[in-house]
Amino acid sequence: MGSSANTETNGNAPPPSSNQKPPATNGVDGSHPPPPPLTPDQAIIESDPSKKRKMGMLPLEVGTRVMCRWRDGKHHPVKVIERRRIHNGGQNDYEYYVHYTEFNRRLDEWTQLDQLDLDSVECAVDEKVEDKVTSLKMTRHQKRKIDETHIEGHEELDAASLREHEEFTKVKNISTIELGKYEIETWYFSPFPPEYNDCVKLFFCEFCLNFMKRKEQLQRHMRKCDLKHPPGDEIYRSGTLSMFEVDGKKNKVYAQNLCYLAKLFLDHKTLYYDVDLFLFYVLCECDDRGCHMVGYFSKEKHSEEAYNLACILTLPSYQRKGYGKFLIAFSYELSKKEGKVGTPERPLSDLGLLSYRGYWTRVLLEILKKHKGNISIKELSDVTAIKAEDILSTLQSLELIQYRKGQHVICADPKVLDRHLKAAGRGGLDVDASKLIWTPYKDQS
């Protein structure tokens, strides 16, 4: 969304032509009339050279780096990603879409000029020259919070694809959504149909996931919508938690809407339009009004690589409740029912690997603590449905594997196991396998 160049005058009048009359004088001495009084804005600029210099910077170019006041009241370094004119504003009246360089792209937002410290302006950087990854400068608390809430999509992208992806999705198109009783601030761009390009906020039916431009449309829809839970089969219920299996082929519109919704909170997720190939497992909190989606994961119906999970999301309004860990555990319970080992789709992001490594660590160490005698990696894989390579890499990262006489040996000192278990943290909500009523997918065609 480039901006066309504007022709600007320098404010100086052209010299009079030969056939023009000289300006009238004001008195016998031939002097010019006194200039008109300065406006307040002009007076400020004239009396404050720094103000004049700052005004000369405007509008800021895309790529400019500057300090920006965030909602915490503090200034943070940002990079201008895009700009747009303010309706009915002056020549230099723009809003600026900025990326906080210390933080994840999900915090990118439109800002007003008064949030920017023009004294800190650095000139625009050529994107072709600058091809660096900004290191995250976070406190331990901030990093832990992002580790616990971050969810990752189907795949990470190579450098060229990542640049193309970030250019196409650099400006968030939908700022907020309403879903059930929550108004949720979105994190990323999602490729909604063109007719929704002018929307800042979307209204979702929390049961069928149809989305609308206006609140009145949602209210009319809710009076007619018969659904009180996701379509598909309820395969698990324990207390107030339910899990529904949704076939992307049988419920195509729901599955596509779920992908649109998920992309608002997943950065490098590939949006699959061919949802026929996937099953979606939608986790809900249930009450007397219905079953309210809190998150989901998807998996391919047929995976040659033994992937048991393609994409996973816990909605922001339900995070930090253990649902992400529950979804990972549930994917392995399905693998056990299938009689197969499973693994998440690769490659994993750093934070995605962190989530899985935490799950694998807790599951494996609990077994090693209780087990008496020798146990092989294959036996651990058979019991847990975790792929042998994932078990080996996890135990190696904990330094619990030694190579002796041509084979890997697990060294499970009880004190060491306890220390690692404590470091791994809580396991989240437990999946009660006895409540799972499910038959593995078989192609009906």
Curated annotation (Swiss-Prot):
Induction: Up-regulated upon UV-B exposure. GO terms for biological process: DNA repair; regulation of DNA-templated transcription; response to UV-B. One of its GO terms (cellular component) is nucleus. It is found in: Nucleus. The modification N6-acetyllysine is found at K269. The active site is at E345 (proton donor/acceptor). Histone acetyltransferase which may be involved in transcriptional activation. Acetylates 'Lys-5' of histone H4 (H4K5ac). Essential for gametophyte development. Negative regulator of flowering controlling the H4K5ac levels in the FLC chromatin. This is Histone acetyltransferase of the MYST family 2.
